[in-house]
Structures are given as C-alpha cells and as structure tokens.
Amino acid sequence: MEPIPREVLDAANSKSRRLRELVRAPEILVMPGAYDVLSALLFEQMGFKAIQGTSGGIAAALGYPDGEAISRELFVELSGKFNAAVSVPFNADGERGYGDENGVKETVRALVAAGVAGMNLEDGAGRKRGGARELVELSEQLRKINAVTEAKRALGSEFFLNARIDAFMVMADDQKKALDEAIRRGNAYAEAGGDCIFYLSVHSREIIGRLAREVKAPISILAGPQSPSVNELQDLGLARVSYGSAFLKAAIGGTRKLAREILENGTVTSLKEGMQTPEINALVTKKNRN
C-alpha cells in the first residue's frame, strides 16, 4: 500500500486519537451529522466536540439517493473538505466501504490521506426505501473489518472504526431475534477491531441498556424523535449518539416552509427564524482564515 506523507498521517492520527478518547470518556459523545461544509462549521462553532458525516444528507444535498450512489472519489473529496474546515475530529460515513475487502482498504487509505479521523462501516445490504433489506453474512463483514485493521497496520494509521449493525432495521418484526443478533455481531465486530458499535432503529430503554451491558465495546445509537434524551442515554451506558440526516431534514423543512409562505402569502416573515448573513459570513470567514 502506497505510504502517506508523514505530516498528513500525523495530523490524521491526532484526530483519530482524539475521537477515540472522546468515545471512551465518561461523558457521552454527541455527534451531529454534517451534510455540507457550512453545517460542519456551525457545529464546531456551537461547541460539539466531534462531527459525523451523513451519507443520506450529503447524497440528498447533491441530488442522489442514499446508498453509495456517489462515487468513492467524490465521497473522499467531500469528506476531506469537511475535515479540513474544522479542527475537531470528523468521522465519515463510509456506508458499506465501497466494495469487497480490497475496496475497503482503498477507502481507508484514501480517507486517511484526506486527514479524516475515522468512518462508519455498515452491515446492511439489499437497499430498500428506508434502509437495508438484509444483513451481509457475519463472516463477510468480519473480513471487511479485518481489512480496515490491515490497512491501518500497513499505513501506520490509528483510524477510528464505527462498526454499524442494522439488525434492528432488518429484523424489525422479531425484536428478540434482532437483539440476539445485535449482541452477537457487536462482540464479534469489537473483537475484530471495531472501536465503537453503532446501532440503528433501536429506541427501547430496555434494549439499549442490554446492548450497553452485553457488548464489550463502546456503544452508540442513531437518535430520532422516539429516542431517550442524551442524559438518559448516558445513564443507560451509551458512549456516543449521532443524528444521521436530521439536520438536512430540518434545513430542507425550513426551506419548504419559506417557499410555501412566498407562494401562498407573498411574504418572507419566516426568514426571521433563519441564520442571518453576518452570522453566515462570520462562519466562512473564520474557515478561510485558518
């Protein structure tokens, strides 16, 4: 594997170490989902300690559906831009890793070269509207996680891996089966090198608590309107919480509200609720001074 310049690798490793420290800290890590550079800048300004990329939000903002619809090259380019804009760790949403084990290695190397702290790697397959249709075989996903470890070793990288499990989405009709599979995979992924185990479609306090107790790694969930509060999640033992494309949804919802007001009333009073030009300019000016 082609080496990465030492100064680039050192900078990436510094952010990877920081992200790992934050996930292992006593206080739960809250990671908002950036869908463009401006949202990443805003999150850093507001005091978030790390930022998550949202594949669904980024794809939608570019006019694509979720699910590796954008190329690896574009994904890496955008992830690098997000990372360069902020000083806090940025974790990319690597979806399924862009290919088999060799593809995963290429993705990891490209992200490290872009200075990115880490990535999500998911085990859902057979996309359908709203999520995965099935889980990839455990052995196949373990090969991908091992590929991440091998790439890190070859590069001298401390890249962070957030291993995502889609069991609760795929097995929504059988929560007991989903929980058993979620625990089994969580421990297997952690043993193979996952730094954090990330679950979707789980909101039950009882289930979240069991995951935190029975999976031998830091645990994270994707939060939604049904989820417990951040304080409750910390009390349940979670290490991390993220929000996927929630902020893109909020932004496009605000755009629709203003557009509807113009069409129906010919006014723009709801614009008062938005961020004003001086605030936006202050964000991007700070970025361009760094």
Identify the role of each PLM range.
Residues 1-12, 19, 246-290:
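Extended, intrinsically disordered, low-complexity segments
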Residues 2-243, 250-257:
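Alpha/beta enzyme core
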